[in-house]
Design a protein with these regions (language model features):
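Short catalytic/ligand-binding loop motif for oxyanion handling, primarily in non-cytosolic enzymes
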Residues: 3, 20, 47-52, 82-86, ...
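Flexible, glycine-/basic-rich loop-and-beta segments that form/coincide
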Residues: 91-117
């Protein structure tokens, strides 16, 4: 994984992970988590197709890897953009946020509202 000297406000990986071999998946996610406690993420799902896609996976696959790193998934973007045809379909389908559990608890406390970040 990439080790940085500090954390950033946001780590972003949009439609990149599917281009890396499955053997690199956990290392890649670890690098994103090393960069920030909040990760904006999307990756091609199985059957999406595309040039150079070698590791298309359902979202649950990525969610399990992030959960090993103690990152919760927040699905707060897709409902807002689902019907916006100006946004490419693969973003509308695949984009989510992962947040480190302690950051989530600090920002949201007992508030279950996903928009508390």
């Amino acid at each position: 994984p990439v080790h940085l000297s500090k954390k950033y406000d946001l780590s972003i990986s949009l439609e990149v992970a599917e281009h890396l071999p499955e053997s690199s998946a956990e290392t890649f996610i670890t690098s994103l988590c090393e960069a920030s406690h909040v990760v904006l993420f999307s990756a091609a799902v199985k059957g999406q197709g595309g040039v150079g896609h070698v590791n298309e996976q359902f979202l649950s696959y990525w969610q399990k890897i992030f959960l090993k790193k103690e990152y919760y998934m927040l699905d707060i973007i897709r409902p807002e953009i689902w019907n916006d045809e100006k946004i490419p379909p693969y973003y509308r389908q695949n984009i989510v946020i992962f947040v480190y559990v302690d950051t989530y608890k600090q920002k949201c406390g007992k508030n279950q509202e996903n928009y508390c970040l």
